[in-house]
Swiss-Prot record:
Membrane-crossing segments per the record: 49-69, 99-119, 132-152, 185-205
Family matches, as InterPro entries: CASP/CASPL, CASP_dom, CASPL
Protein name in UniProt: Casparian strip membrane protein 1
The keyword Repressor appears for this protein: no
Pfam family, one: CASP_dom
Main subcellular location of this protein, as a coarse class: membrane
Source organism: Cynara cardunculus var. scolymus
């Protein structure tokens, strides 16, 4: 009787098997989390560029609008006059100054109208088409604003220094206030050009 022995085989219950299942499924879950974490910084990077794009467009509106207003309000009349002449300087005396006002006003309006597109890029940072459109339009505005600022800068230079070869005297000694406003407008316009170029670079990096 004492020599007899009984062998009992214990099998795993379904509950015990279920208890081990999460341990086996844990690695795929963690790998999925890694994939999500790898994609998140990319979208955040583009979203940050889009936010900076909006800020630069607001700055460009301020500089372009300031340039147009400063040039458009240029008007100075000298305190002395003759029987036949009154010495007065206005921006519309020169076609280049008129073009300058129109070009900067167009640029300011364009930057305001493209802010909604930049907001779309903030909401959906992975979109490519809006950024390509902004690159094209910003390049056109760079050409327009540079042409206006460059043409006006040459005239302002002559107004300050004159040209002895062409017998053109400097007039800024007489029209000091007008020349200061015009010079400030040219500086603001070139700042707008810099802003537009930065916008192009930002859009290119975000593609």
């Amino acid at each position: 009787m004492e020599a007899d022995s009984t062998t009992i085989n214990v099998t795993e219950t379904p509950k015990e098997r279920k208890g081990k299942a999460p341990l086996l499924a844990a690695p795929p879950a963690s790998s999925g989390v890694k994939r999500v974490l790898q994609k998140a910084p990319k979208g955040g990077y583009k979203r940050g560029l889009a936010v900076f794009d909006v800020v630069l467009r607001l700055a460009g509106i301020a500089t372009a609008l300031g340039a147009a207003i400063a040039m458009g309000s240029t008007d100075q009349t000298l305190p002395f006059f003759t029987q036949f002449f009154q010495f007065k300087a206005e921006f519309d005396d020169l076609p280049a100054f008129t073009f300058f006002v129109i070009a900067n006003a167009i640029t300011a309006a364009y930057l305001a109208l493209t802010i909604p597109i930049s907001i779309v890029c903030i909401i959906r940072p992975h979109l490519v088409a809006p950024r390509v459109l902004l690159i094209f339009l910003d390049t056109v505005m760079v050409a327009l604003t540079t042409a206006a600022a460059g043409g006006t800068a040459s005239i302002v230079y002559l107004a300050h220094n004159g040209n002895s070869d062409a017998n053109w005297p400097a007039i800024c000694q007489q029209f000091n206030d007008x020349c200061q406003k015009v010079s400030g407008a040219v500086v603001a316009s070139f700042l707008t050009v810099v802003v537009l170029m930065l916008l192009i670079v930002l859009s290119a990096f975000a593609l």
